[in-house]
Amino acid sequence: MFSYEKKLQYPVNIKKKDLRMAKYLVTQYGGANGELGAALRYLNQRMTMPDNKGKALLTDIGTEELGHVEMLETMIYQLMKDATLEELQQAGLDAHYAEHAKALFPTDANGVPFTVAYFATTGDPLADISEDMAAEQKARAVYENLIDLTDDPDVIGPLLWLRQREIVHFDRFKELFEYYQKMLKNGNNEMKIVDNKKMMLEDSQWYFNN
């Protein structure tokens, strides 16, 4: 069950219009390393984590990523809300306007629509958490690139906060990965997966031959 609070995780109050930056920011909304993909990745992977520790972490982080989506939507909207049609055309957003006017739509910075092909679920906790750690590092790198592209403190502040959350998430996933890895090394070769009914992973000891 989800509970919605009518406030952002970090305040967003952008005063200056910047269509160029709006065009860049959308990549962290609907791009390959963006927050929408992260939320869907974790909320799907959580169901086949082997215990409540893993399920809880992926639920918590996946839910937080939905809050990050809301932050980015707010930032993009504020950056372009007062733009004229001529300004949108000059910024290369005329194709977006043709289909969506000033409404939001998840794409990357090149206008490529969001796709679920950006993330995977395997049912293997170690494989999925490895992907999650890589995803957080890539998102951090993109936020750093975006920060380089603006000098507006009203934009930089939320981006710095989002970047820091990627670092925290990476650390939490790393801890979970090491926890499951240690569990298997200690001889627990059948990590129970709960998905309505009990299922068992095949012996995974071969992961740890070294």
Can you describe what each PLM-predicted range is?
Residues M1-N210:
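Non-heme di-metal
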